[in-house]
Design a protein with these regions (language model features):
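A generic structural signal for short hydrophobic patches within well-formed alpha-helices
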Residues: 76, 135, 175, 189-190
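Conserved beta-loop-beta/alpha segment of the NTase-like Rossmann-fold superfamily
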Residues: 99-165, 179
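Conserved alpha/beta core of the MobA/IspD/sugar-nucleotide pyrophosphorylase nucleotidyltransferase superfamily
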Residues: 21, 99, 176-223
Length: 223
């Protein structure tokens, strides 16, 4: 793994609720939802009377200094109409998305005119069930170490594909499934996105960060 192996971050040492840092959240919502199916991108699919994206924004709002929503131009008016129809007035700004997730996140980060030492968290638009406890742990860990991401242990068996033998089983305890929000010091993540090749095969923000910084990324257990 390219990440720090301190899996269970010690809440009793690093976290005091009264001094919990807040975070500038970036929500890339440009996906077309092909894996999910249906006529709409999955972030706009309704669950319990509201689009999933609204549930996601509500989940992070208590921990947010600001929220930047990244949307393709084609969906900005649609989203604004949804907000009017649902009387959804949670404060956020909209930034136009790029052709890829990488470019969308970079656009949003560049738009943040805030303290470069502030925390920025990048969270998927269709992860509304993130718990407050997980967010709090991530903010505390990132404030100390500079970078923190949530993970879950793998429960499925996994195999490594090999050209000559086809595949081989591997020890799944040596791997974890990474989730969001991924939280960083803004100045460092911004520098990583500026230096990174947008055509590289980055799978998340942590991989962009690692391309520039040889520094541990704290792993925080997710809900």
């Amino acid at each position: 793994l390219g990440y720090s192996h301190q899996y269970l971050y010690p809440r009793e040492i690093v976290f005091a609720r009264r001094s919990m840092p807040k975070c500038h959240f970036v929500i890339p919502a440009g996906g077309v939802g092909l894996r999910f199916g249906g006529p709409l991108p999955k972030q706009f699919v309704e669950v319990e009377g509201l689009p999933i994206l609204m549930h996601t924004l509500r989940a992070i709002a208590p921990y947010a200094e600001s929220i930047t929503l990244v949307l393709p131009q084609d969906y900005q008016k649609y989203w604004q109409q949804l907000c009017r129809d649902r009387s959804f007035d949670l404060e956020h700004k909209i930034v136009e998305g790029g052709a890829t997730r990488f470019l969308s996140v970079r656009n949003a980060i560049e738009s943040l005119a805030v303290d470069p030492d502030a925390l920025v968290g990048v969270h998927d638009a269709v992860r509304p069930l993130i718990s407050g406890e997980t967010i709090e742990d991530l903010l505390a860990a990132a404030e100390l170490s500079g970078a923190a991401i949530p993970y879950l242990p793998l429960t499925d068996s996994i195999r490594h594909l090999e050209p000559l033998v086809g595949s081989k089983s591997v020890d799944r305890t040596q791997f974890v499934a990474v989730q969001t929000p991924q939280v960083f010091h803004l100045e460092r993540l911004r520098a990583a996105y500026r230096q990174a090749d947008g055509g590289a095969n980055f799978t998340d923000d942590a991989s962009v960060y690692e391309a520039l910084f040889d520094a541990p990324i704290e792993l925080v257990v997710s809900n």
